[in-house]
């Protein structure tokens, strides 16, 4: 039995934060942001739009697209870098919001690679026969952890949610053909949220030192991102018994246009076949690839046997690649 994606969904908050808005907040410009990142605007969640809420909203659309009832879902995996709480899990909160029966529900914290890790978990469960219908959710309200006085990070991130339903392959679904994942904790300090966990719990000092905001070593992250995603993608292609020219669409993590372009060049993918949502939504962390995949499927006809290559990179450091094929 092979696992496949039955349906996808996404959710974006209504509030738009443009580059022009950021010009009024920090020392930056639309030209500076656009040329360095490719981002024009991003969505910012309201006080009521937390990660579990956005994920649940995306899940409703995925369930509808999959043409199933909520009662068929027998496991929930929630990928996030910005959970509502350390506990209870955002998966359990989304489960309650959706009114889904008391099935296993847990979080997966792999930052921006989360959607791919979630797909991998769902694939393994379905193909092992452990569960028949797994709901994978990825959502992040990263604006809660962005320092809007730091122009190097505040221009990058936006909020959003994505989801998909994974089950045994059926006609019209997207078969999850091959997965390759990796992580390197030795490089963890390059991209992290320093305080708030058990190693560095919240205190007056951590607040005064602004340690509850995202920190990033941009140049080092860029180098690792391109190299690691290229490795994961090429390994995936080789293990699937394919050639690079067999890939019809590239759906990358929407982090930075320079990173996306660097990956596309390494695979000689035509620009029209590299799907981007970056300019509209910025980097939406774990939900990024899922949002892009959902938008691609809703705006383009993916023909039978076409293959999609998903690639992502995030904190951990973590990375991954997944090959999907239209059934």
UniProtKB/Swiss-Prot annotation:
What is the E.C. number?
Answer: 2.3.1.180
Enumerate the UniProt keywords alphabetically: Acyltransferase, Cytoplasm, Fatty acid biosynthesis, Fatty acid metabolism, Lipid biosynthesis, Lipid metabolism, Multifunctional enzyme, Transferase
| GO terms (BP aspect) | fatty acid biosynthetic process; secondary metabolite biosynthetic process
Any one GO CC term of this protein is: cytoplasm
Pathway, according to UniProt?
A: Lipid metabolism; fatty acid biosynthesis
**Where does the UniProt annotation locate this protein?**
Cytoplasm
Pfam families (alphabetical): ACP_syn_III (PF08545), ACP_syn_III_C (PF08541)
SUPFAM superfamilies xrefs:
Thiolase-like
Predominant place of localization: cytoplasm
Catalyses which reaction(s): malonyl-[ACP] + acetyl-CoA + H(+) = 3-oxobutanoyl-[ACP] + CO2 + CoA
The answer to whether UniProt assigns keyword Mitochondrion to this entry is no
Q: Which family does it belong to?
A: Belongs to the thiolase-like superfamily. FabH family.
Task of the protein: Catalyzes the condensation reaction of fatty acid synthesis by the addition to an acyl acceptor of two carbons from malonyl-ACP. Catalyzes the first condensation reaction which initiates fatty acid synthesis and may therefore play a role in governing the total rate of fatty acid production. Possesses both acetoacetyl-ACP synthase and acetyl transacylase activities. Its substrate specificity determines the biosynthesis of branched-chain and/or straight-chain of fatty acids.
Q: What is known of its domains?
A: The last Arg residue of the ACP-binding site is essential for the weak association between ACP/AcpP and FabH.
Protein name stated in the entry: Beta-ketoacyl-[acyl-carrier-protein] synthase III
| Organism from which the protein derives | Chlamydia muridarum (strain MoPn / Nigg)
